[in-house]
Design a protein with these regions (language model features):
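Bacterial N-terminal signal peptides
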Residues: 9-19
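Structured catalytic-domain cores with a bias toward divalent-metal coordination
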Residues: 25-439
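Bacterial N-terminal signal peptides that target proteins for export
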Residues: 1-11
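Sec/Tat signal peptide C-region and signal peptidase I cleavage site
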Residues: 20-24
């Protein structure tokens, strides 16, 4: 029989030998180890410094992740982007970046576009924290990244093989300000996000999401450069808060009318991704997600992070989700208790904890990434198709359809052909009298 010290030494050696053969993901620093609690725990809100410390550890520990400095913030912090994919994709990421750029610029013919779409990887942008008092955004970013680098289930591995995910913190300065403000008191029950002492973006505060066409702030410039001159993601997902009262989240599709100035593959692409999100929420028994006229969000505001993406032929997504590290209540709203087209799975009034908002955000992210994986080639090819459509329209005369112009056409027809009647229709040869009326 071995003496105890000798037995202990052999046991330790056996454990070390076994762990040496494990993949990097098996030895990752967990949220519990890093923060002392799970992400989304009540009354806890890690700041940007804590996020960076953890991401730097994970980047050193995992072969699924690289941490990239994309520039300075208004207050001089480093703004980081985490690139997450399979180890093989990360080793060859420059080639995949160039493929995405080539397709987005639409400077190749159809045969080349098909070939590049088969060879390339879908690129998906997920950001968080732009409006820093909407604290879920940055926290869900941390949790989703953690799940992608730590899980080894078939779906996650497939996503990592097919997709390159860009996790971008949109407002590092604001996260430090808001998190430090919330946790300034040791009395958990007194913690509050109210009465922030200053703007959470040094110069423009909440209007940092009005800056993506003017690009006046360093954070905006950093992100626009990555999106529109470096990586050209096919999908841009912008997380916000808060959800409509009596629900948990608003998710696409957006309300009508959609912006008819965009390529039709934009609204149909948004609808495709939105359907995947809602279907996954229902399948995971997560009620309370509304769409379309469940809130007033649309494709019309042109200065925001996800809406400027439409002008670059990218599928821009927005979700608005409830949640705070201080528990809240979902109120009873009678009009939101009966299932309908824009709220197929209502939620009952109840106490709500921050961790559940994290879980909903992860579900939404995984729905997007799963779809990008399954339709990788189509997303790559369609951004090329939209680019070619734009080049063609810009290279020849065309009639842009606007409501006012259509009204002018109707008035002109009525003035020139008053005898035609209300049911006349215009055809290439002229008006047709007595066209069928409504049935």
């Amino acid at each position: 029989m071995l003496k105890p010290p000798r037995a202990a030494a052999l046991a330790v050696a056996a454990v070390l030998a076994a762990s040496a053969g494990l993949p990097a993901q098996a030895r990752l620093t967990t949220p519990q180890q890093q923060f002392g609690h799970e992400i989304g725990a009540d009354y806890r809100l890690p700041n940007y410094r804590a996020l960076v410390d953890w991401w730097q550890k994970l980047a050193a520990e995992s072969d699924r992740m690289e941490l990239v400095d994309i520039g300075r913030t208004a207050e001089g912090r480093t703004q980081y982007m985490a690139i997450v994919s399979s180890p093989a994709n990360l080793r060859d990421r420059e080639r995949y970046r160039q493929t995405a750029a080539t397709l987005a610029r639409a400077r190749v013919d159809s045969a080349q576009a098909v070939r590049l779409s088969r060879e390339g990887k879908a690129v998906v942008w997920i950001d968080g924290g732009l409006h820093a008092n909407e604290v879920l955004g940055a926290q869900q970013l941390m949790e989703t990244l953690w799940q992608l680098v730590s899980r080894s289930d078939p779906e996650t591995l497939r996503i990592l093989d097919d997709v390159i995910v860009l996790f971008v913190h949109a407002n590092p300065d604001g996260m430090d300000l808001v998190s430090n403000w919330y946790t300034r008191t040791p009395d958990l029950q007194r913690r509050s996000l109210a009465a922030l002492p200053r703007l959470y973006q040094k110069y423009i505060g909440h209007d940092n999401n009005r800056d993506f066409y003017a690009s006046t702030q360093p954070e905006t410039e950093n992100m626009n450069r990555v999106m529109y001159t470096e990586w050209y993601p096919q999908i841009v997902y912008n997380h916000h808060q808060t959800g409509p009262s009596g629900t948990v989240m608003f998710a696409p599709p957006f309300r009508d009318p959609f912006n008819y100035a965009f390529d039709p593959l934009i609204p149909t692409g948004i609808d495709l991704v939105g359907a995947a999100m809602h279907t996954r929420f229902e399948a995971e028994d997560k009620p309370g997600v509304t769409m379309r006229r469940g809130a007033n969000y649309s494709t019309w505001w042109n200065g925001g992070l996800r809406t400027t993406a439409y002008f670059h032929n990218m599928i821009g997504l927005l979700t608005e989700t409830i949640g705070s590290p201080t528990p809240i209540d979902i109120p009873f709203i009678a009009d939101r208790q009966l299932p309908r087209g824009d709220l197929p799975f209502p939620i009952e009034p109840q106490r709500w904890h921050f961790r559940r908002s994290i879980d909903y955000s992860v579900t939404a992210n995984y729905a997007v990434l799963d779809l990008a994986s399954r339709y990788r080639e189509q997303f790559l090819y369609r951004i090329w198709r939209m680019g070619m459509n734009s080049i063609r329209r810009g290279s020849q005369d065309h009639w842009t359809r606007y409501p006012r112009r259509l009204d002018e056409v109707r008035d002109s027809i009525a003035a020139r052909q008053p005898q035609a009647g209300a049911n006349a229709v215009m055809v290439p040869g002229g008006l047709v009298q007595g066209a069928p009326g409504p049935v």
